[in-house]
Amino acid sequence: MLVCIGFTASTTFMLFMNCNQELGKLYGMANPSMIQSFYSAGIICAVLLTAALMKKGLKPIRVLVIYPCVAFCALLLMYFVQIPQICMIGGFLIGYFAAGGVLQLATSTANEMFPRDKGKITAVVMIASSIANYAVLNVASLLSKVGGVEGPRYILLFNAVVTAIGIVFAIILNLRFEKDAQ
């Protein structure tokens, strides 16, 4: 499950990072590069606030469900609300809830679950992330070609589907974790 989350977590932020400017243009933004600034601000906030929440007792395994759920909602919001401002709001939300440490928390959770094989499990999760970098960008390229002007919106939907799959994996993982804890 954690390996699959490595794939889906990477997909969520990477697809957005690579396609947000085209989405901004489609939605009529005068300066679509602003999306990247909001995305980066989201990442910085996520790192700081998530660390504080962890110190207060939030479990990383819970973040693996909560953060992708918010990212999923942000992707759908950007799909349905086609105005320039939503790109900046969505950029911040994806930066925070997708790029702000979900992959790293998946890796640390894997290390916690497999303490004797930390190196191996880290490598496998990161290999899944690397495969996502290659595979989903190729799919996004195809969607962009097939979708024409609407290509960025098709990519949002594809991203939402992959993120939803990651949420299912995270829920299953949480249920197993709870069962093992009892």
Role assignments for model-derived ranges:
Residues M1-I44, T107:
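Extracytoplasmic gate region of multi-pass secondary transporters
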Residues F7, I86-G101:
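Hydrophobic core of transmembrane alpha-helices in multi-pass small-molecule transporters
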Residues S40-L48, S130-Y134:
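Residue-level signature of mid-helix packing/kink "hotspots" within the transmembrane helices
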Residues A46-K59, S144:
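Helix-to-loop junctions at the C-terminal end of transmembrane segments
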Residues R62-L77:
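Structural signature of the two symmetry-related core transmembrane helices
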Residues G100-F114:
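Intracellular juxtamembrane helix-capping segments at the cytosolic ends
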Residues Y154-N174:
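Symmetry-related core transmembrane helices of the 12-TM Major Facilitator Superfamily/SLC fold
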